[in-house]
Amino acid sequence: MRDGLRSRLDPNHNHPPLAVLWSIVAGSVLVFALTAFAVRNGWTDSLDRSILLALRDASDPSDAWGPAWFEETAAELTALGGYPILVTVSALTLAVLALMRNWAAALFLAIGLSGGAALSSVLKLGFERARPDLVDHMDRTFTSSFPSAHAMVGMLFYLTLAAVAVRFVPRHSVRVFMVCAAFAIAIVIGSSRVYLGVHWPSDVLAGWSLGVGWASLCWLAAHYLSRRRGDRDALGHSRT
């Protein structure tokens, strides 16, 4: 029974087709590269500004579109992509996997999340894009703007968490729903950053693309490492 449970949590168990994963990685890198190039050359400035201003009262840029409860909801939803919640949920998930002695899934989750967070920080230092100055910020910020860490790490985290969780679910339709739900949560988080005035839309687009690409790359790495381990085990058995 325990072996069956471990197989369900193996990152390589029922993985998406490799061609699909490679296509997603390539597409994500392309979207990020094009977005970064456009940002560097100022080609996104007009659209970024138009979207930000469209979400604010024309007569008072400090007032976001919608009633007060909607503004409060956006502030609470954006916290789902903040490090306090992500680190807490990650720690609890890793603890559960450790208690199950499923080190492969735990390592997959830990490396994927920590690597994605590190990549986001490095890119922020490299681009050093200023935060939006058109509207009042409705959330505190401490780093530069491009790419959005909330969008990137949120996308990576919830997709990776869903990838681990679906190992328990036998029905394909339910697995698809869980992955789609994770994707939707990440979209809401990124959108809330623009609504709150703390990110340009192009920051969020770049973050989303990197999050999807990094999650897919982690799946590919898990597959190839698992296959190499299987080849070594098979070679060892053939020699005995």
Model segments located where?
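N-terminal transmembrane-helix/juxtamembrane module of multi-pass inner/ER membrane proteins
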Residues: 1-84, 126-127, 131-137
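Hydrophobic alpha-helical transmembrane segments
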Residues: 19-23, 36-37, 84-87, 94-100, 106-111, 176-183, 193-194, ...
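Hydrophobic alpha-helical membrane-associated segments
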Residues: 39, 43, 115, 192-193, ...
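Membrane-interface loops
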Residues: 45, 49-59, 63, 88-180
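Generic alpha-helical transmembrane segments of integral inner-membrane proteins
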Residues: 26-33, 88-95, 110, 114, ...
